[in-house]
């Protein structure tokens, strides 16, 4: 059996996936690169200060727009995950030792970058007794303490649905608690074998019950049907999800799940209208939308739709700005 780039042996599933060549993207999937002054300043700062964000390391297509708005995403808990999802670029393996200084370093990067809004996401750490709950919570707390004008969104694993571990994360009071369901029940176990669809919905419900703004994401093109997308949207809204993002699956490498279909822009328009009609407070949909795309602006819109005032320190998130270039209208 051949080896993966990280040196480990490829799984049988990965070998089977690799039999299908990487698909050619349709003409409507194009990045709109607008390198404004804020983006250029941040790019130079990140380079000279040797800072690290998911944005540049994952070559996110939305980096130009998000950085222009002083938003960025950070990965905590290491570069390897204890779980494997068939769409995810992060490799599976034994994670690095627990780094208790990481929250301070992330908060310092947020300060030096002058971010208006930071998204923090982490790998699953099933090897730890608390599955990384303290690390998630402490990173949010440290960013808030060191950067009072910065909003924080936590994009978390499910922590096995454990209420005590989730309560630790909730206690840090992020502006948004996000947990991505990603796909529909019929194909969920095949694509995300270490997660459970109903458990993920319950995690979102627990976030709602903690009086947090909640968020999730659906990736299309992994084998779902259009009807199943509608059913998943209804499930998420019933679970208490406030914000939903919907995107196209783009295959990270030949080892990953082949693309089942390319969703046309008009279908994203239809899905966005459907999600808004269901009652989601914030909806972004489009081939290149990602769950952290323009997250601060979407949070501000959702707070307004919920009838809540933004904290005075975060009022700037509602300032007029360019629209969501990568999302359908």
Curated annotation (Swiss-Prot):
Pfam family, one: LIAS_N
Location within or outside the cell: Cytoplasm
Signal peptide (UniProt feature, chain positions): none
Residues binding [4Fe-4S] cluster 1: 55, 60, 66, 292
Top EC class, one word: transferase
EC number, UniProt record: 2.8.1.8
Pathway listed: Protein modification; protein lipoylation via endogenous pathway; protein N(6)-(lipoyl)lysine from octanoyl-[acyl-carrier-protein]: step 2/2
Catalytic activity: [[Fe-S] cluster scaffold protein carrying a second [4Fe-4S](2+) cluster] + N(6)-octanoyl-L-lysyl-[protein] + 2 oxidized [2Fe-2S]-[ferredoxin] + 2 S-adenosyl-L-methionine + 4 H(+) = [[Fe-S] cluster scaffold protein] + N(6)-[(R)-dihydrolipoyl]-L-lysyl-[protein] + 4 Fe(3+) + 2 hydrogen sulfide + 2 5'-deoxyadenosine + 2 L-methionine + 2 reduced [2Fe-2S]-[ferredoxin]
GO MF annotations in UniProt: 4 iron, 4 sulfur cluster binding; lipoate synthase activity; metal ion binding
GO CC annotation: cytoplasm
Record keywords: 4Fe-4S, Cytoplasm, Iron, Iron-sulfur, Metal-binding, S-adenosyl-L-methionine, Transferase
Gene3D superfamilies xrefs: Aldolase class I
SMART domains on file: Elp3
PANTHER family (alphabetical): LIPOYL SYNTHASE, LIPOYL SYNTHASE, MITOCHONDRIAL
Protein name as catalogued: Lipoyl synthase
Taxonomy of the source species: Bacteria, Bacillati, Actinomycetota, Actinomycetes, Micrococcales
């Amino acid at each position: 059996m051949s080896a993966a780039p990280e040196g480990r042996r490829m799984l049988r599933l990965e070998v089977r996936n690799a039999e299908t060549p990487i698909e050619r993207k349709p003409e409507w999937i194009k990045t709109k690169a607008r390198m404004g002054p804020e983006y250029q300043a941040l790019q130079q700062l990140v380079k000279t200060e040797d800072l690290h964000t998911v944005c540049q390391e994952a070559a996110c297509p939305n980096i130009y727009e998000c950085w222009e708005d002083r938003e960025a995403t950070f990965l905590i808990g290491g570069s390897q995950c204890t779980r494997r999802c068939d769409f995810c670029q992060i490799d599976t393996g034994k994670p690095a030792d627990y780094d208790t200084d990481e929250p301070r370093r992330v908060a310092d990067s947020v300060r030096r970058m002058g971010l208006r809004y930071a998204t923090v996401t982490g790998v699953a750490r099933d090897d730890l007794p608390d599955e990384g709950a303290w690390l998630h919570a402490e990173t949010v707390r440290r960013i808030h303490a060191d950067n009072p004008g910065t909003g924080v969104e936590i994009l978390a694993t499910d922590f096995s649905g454990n209420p005590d571990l989730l309560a630790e994360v909730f206690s840090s009071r992020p502006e948004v608690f996000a947990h991505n369901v990603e796909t529909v029940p019929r194909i969920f176990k095949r694509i995300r074998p270490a997660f459970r669809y109903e458990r993920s919905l319950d995690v979102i419900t627990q976030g709602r019950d903690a009086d947090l703004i909640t968020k999730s994401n659906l990736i299309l093109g992994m084998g779902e049907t259009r009807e199943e997308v509608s059913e998943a949207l209804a499930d998420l809204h019933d679970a208490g999800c406030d914000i939903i993002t919907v995107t196209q699956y783009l295959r990270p490498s030949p080892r990953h799940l082949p693309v089942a279909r390319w969703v046309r822009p008009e279908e994203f328009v239809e899905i966005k209208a459907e999600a808004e009609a269901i009652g989601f407070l914030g909806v972004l949909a489009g081939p290149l939308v990602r769950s952290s795309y323009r997250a601060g602006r979407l949070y501000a819109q959702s707070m307004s739709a919920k009838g809540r005032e933004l904290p005075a320190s975060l009022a700037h998130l509602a300032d007029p700005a360019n629209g969501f270039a990568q999302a359908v209208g």
